[in-house]
Amino acid sequence: MIITIGGLPGTGTTTIAKMIAEKYNLRHVCAGFIFREMAKEMGMDLQEFSKYAEQHKEIDEEIDRRQVEIAKQGNVVLEGRLAAWMLLKNGIKPDLTIWFKAPLEVRAERISKRENIDKDVALKKMIEREASEKKRYKEIYNIDLDDLSIYDLVIDTSKWDVEGVFNIVSSAIDNLKK
């Protein structure tokens, strides 16, 4: 089984992807973890590394290559904004593609709590990072992140608590046509 979960920062992708991986005994692979690790290796914060990646498309290409190779092995929850796009572009049809969304203010609040920073700082960083990513994805892949047509399920995670979102996703998985 191959499941992709994507969404903008602060929508709950990591939380739910971990829970789904555990429940269904799947591996959890997160593009964001790979990206953060690469930023750390280069001694940059996420905003700096995002800007750097705009000029160095090999960063995104390496993340994508790793995701596709892992997906080919199956039994995985791939978490990342481009996970579904990358698999489809490489001829791999996931069993379920999911996109999480939530209002900007809600996401900023979640990020401020998670990273223990001021909400306004979180909002500013989030807006900068998203603008950088949108630009990169359009230039490198010709992907518009606002195009949600490839997703089987789009969930506004501000409408339910974590358990509610988990139940919705679990129900979708349990009811997939065999």
From Swiss-Prot:
Is Membrane a UniProt keyword of this protein?
A: no
Record's superkingdom?
Answer: Archaea
Identify the residues that bind ATP.
7-15
Pfam families given for it?
A: Cytidylate_kin2
Q: Which InterPro entries match?
A: Cyt_kin_arch (IPR011892), Cytidylate_kinase_dom (IPR011994), P-loop_NTPase (IPR027417)
Q: Which keywords does this Swiss-Prot/TrEMBL entry list?
A: ATP-binding, Cytoplasm, Kinase, Nucleotide-binding, Transferase
Per its UniProt record, what HAMAP family does this chain match?
Answer: Cytidyl_kinase_type2
Name of the molecule in the record = Cytidylate kinase
Q: What is the lineage of its organism?
A: Archaea, Methanobacteriati, Methanobacteriota, Methanomada group, Methanococci
